[in-house]
Amino acid sequence: MKKHIPNAITMMNLFSGCVAVAMAFSGNFGAVVVWVLMAAVFDFFDGFAARLLGVSSKMGVELDSLADVVSFGVAPATAVFILLRDFSAYPDFLLPLSTILPYTAFLLPVFSALRLAKFNLDDRQTSSFLGLPTPADALFWISYCYGVQYLSPLNEKICYSTLGFIVIFSLLMVSEIPMFSLKIKKIQFAGNEKQALLVVSMIAFVALWGIIGVAWGILFYIALSIFGNSFGKTKR
């Protein structure tokens, strides 16, 4: 019986992702944030439960990836699609493409699937990541969409930034750039400096700017990973 518990938690992740997709189509980005965050919680606890109970299976690994594609790929991409579909400030030269450009959002789940497949086959990513993790990508987009909808007036810069971020984040997910993990093996500051700095910064960003502060936190996470790696190499 206990071997089915982690898979049941994973299916709650998938269910949350499906509801997030439905909420995105209705334009309720606040609900999208809630359901994707719930999916992230379930995504954490399915692995935690598997380790705690001492159970694992190939089915569990595959099911986890399928759930993540929906919750952290399709769900945030649907929110981005709706944002671009209803966008009213396309620059003049992009107006002829305004009915096509929203579909670029679905590059995100495509590259999420590639990233997850790569992760499953890569034994180098046990204590850290190569490329941007899909949950981090999802957190960026759900907070970005939630925050942007309240900006007035919407302008061409938002159009450019959204399309640019789609390309950048898609490539980051399948890149070979080392990204540190938030998993803390020991409750001590030494060895967890980056994680502590990120958590404190994320809290500060959210306190200053609300939910869209999460997007700034993810950008800080990317910068901290990249420049932290560069500093480490220089130091050595």
Indicate where each model-derived feature is located.
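Short juxtamembrane and helix-loop transition motifs at transmembrane-helix boundaries
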Residues: 1, 25-31, 91-100, 119-127, ...
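Topogenic membrane-insertion module of multi-pass membrane proteins
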Residues: 1-44, 217, 222, 228
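Interhelical loop and helix-boundary elements at the membrane-water interface
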Residues: 1-14, 50-69, 114-136, 178-193, ...
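Multi-pass membrane catalytic core of lipid/isoprenoid biosynthesis enzymes
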Residues: 7-10, 52-117
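Hydrophobic alpha-helical transmembrane segments of polytopic
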Residues: 9-12, 32-39, 104-111, 137, ...
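Alpha-helical transmembrane segments of polytopic integral membrane proteins
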Residues: 18-21, 38, 76, 110-113, ...
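Helix-coil boundary and interhelical linker segments in multi-pass alpha-helical membrane proteins
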Residues: 19-34, 76-103, 144-161, 208-212
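C-terminal membrane-associated helical module and adjoining short loops/tails
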Residues: 126-236
